[in-house]
């Protein structure tokens, strides 16, 4: 019994443990304790566990997360004995190139074994591959500085471990004292933000020391293959074209320029650049469009190459042999500027070898300008008279006479046949001046049609071109033919496709030179703008508007003076038309009757007062019942009797207002009988007189 009582006591105590003691249940706020106490207990417990787990997680993150992430990415290989991490495989570089292949793997792996711990069990395949990588980079460095400058920013986290593995080659390339392994990587592993800042030091020193001699260029096929593998990220210009590389390449380009210009049959020298030539597998890359065509320093090379191959516009006819061209000698400043433009490090990234891919050898007549030119007589505006006289003798009518006739006659002359066409030469002026050998100069043949009488619009465009001194000096050559004082302005052929945009007559596909790639959208925009400019030049829209305005003002001022009677007639017609329309309108009374026109408020009040006054007057004059009986107006006074009736609710259910069906039948019968007796009808139609259904 005691055991049961003890067990019962235990059972009674167990459920009462979580609840409050019975003394507290008597208080007012016992219910609040039930609600809030478990909530407080849970919050306190959860905060303790959260703090413990957060500490554990922070400890794990600070120690292991960087290494795990790097191992997952493939940047590190886990070494259990040593704290330093070794890169596992060579990832693609940031600028889109692959790293260089190892030169001799057996020596590198052996050298790595000597540097690392002696108790490590054999080289792993991955670690062998990755540790060979820095050795190969350091050994190939004097031969391929391009690859060295790109390999140096590869491993942002593993740069601290790469340095002690190969102290000798890196110290040869960059004067930098390597640290031992225990100083670089202590036993406590460092997070990412502490290891990473060491990396730009290597890149800057390696990139600043490394220079690229032009005679020791690495094989370009490997780099071009890496280009085709990863074309997503373009190479960064400060890495691929460093200042030292461009300086040495510019010096070599100047030397080859000066040597090739003296030789007439040599091809056009192109400055040496990092970009690989297009291989047989890859299609030729279209060059980007230059920013400013006139001021580009590489346009000189293009213009010289274009001068070599004779370009003829579309539809040009064959011309007689070319006379020697007299041109201004190129100033020494222009020559020095041209050579200096190829040299400095701010070279635009569109070299001439991309713009001129074929680069045909120029004939002896179009050889390059020697650096020291003998002085040439100044430019004369008229061609030799011998050629002009030959052409005039070929046609029956002399050319200057036809020009005088064309200028004097107001109508254009009819076109003659091909035998009477005057063919002349257009002498080309390049920005760099003519290329001479002896006294003969090769220029572009252009046929000139017969001169017509220019319209006013053409005169304006010619005056604009002749008045501007810069355009007349640089782009035009004035030709005086015979004794005529009139000036024919002929625009010269500009280098590249600038004139094609302005004229719109010569297309890129018709020219024999290299195809100059242009974006279609930009070409359309240029055509639109040039067309708009030509339209504005041709048509003076302001004068047309002003003339039209003056004509309209004159017509307005002359009209009333000229036709007063007609104006009066028009006014009368309008008046009669308005009167007819007004007569067809409904009147105000009709609109009021149709409730369309609302009456005025004052009129409505006055009308109500009038109605009230009339009614009161009639009621006041109304005779009484006695007067009507006396005047014998009321003759049925014997059965008319007036009784005072009490007001009652007829809607109420009263017994005297309730009719039974028998009462209703009796009423109907009485009415039918009354009607049949009151009306004298035929016997056959008597049933029509029934008032109610019986």
UniProtKB/Swiss-Prot annotation:
InterPro entries: RPEL_repeat. Residues 455-467, 499-511, 519-529 have a biased composition (Acidic residues). Residues 1-13, 46-72 have a biased composition (Basic and acidic residues). Gene3D superfamilies: 6.10.140.1750, 6.10.140.2130. Its main location: cytoplasm. Residues 300-317 have a biased composition (Low complexity). RPEL repeats lie at residues 55-80, 576-601, 613-638. GO terms for biological process: actin cytoskeleton organization; closure of optic fissure; enteric nervous system development; negative regulation of integrin-mediated signaling pathway; neural crest cell migration; neural tube closure; positive regulation of catalytic activity; regulation of cell cycle. Regulator of protein phosphatase 1 (PP1) required for neural tube and optic fissure closure, and enteric neural crest cell (ENCCs) migration during development. Acts as an activator of PP1. During neural tube closure, localizes to the ventral neural tube and activates PP1, leading to down-regulate cell proliferation within cranial neural tissue and the neural retina. Also acts as a regulator of migration of enteric neural crest cells (ENCCs) by activating PP1, leading to repression of the integrin signaling through the rho/rock pathway. PANTHER family: PHOSPHATASE AND ACTIN REGULATOR 4, PHOSPHATASE AND ACTIN REGULATOR PHACTR. This is Phosphatase and actin regulator 4-A. The gene is phactr4-a.
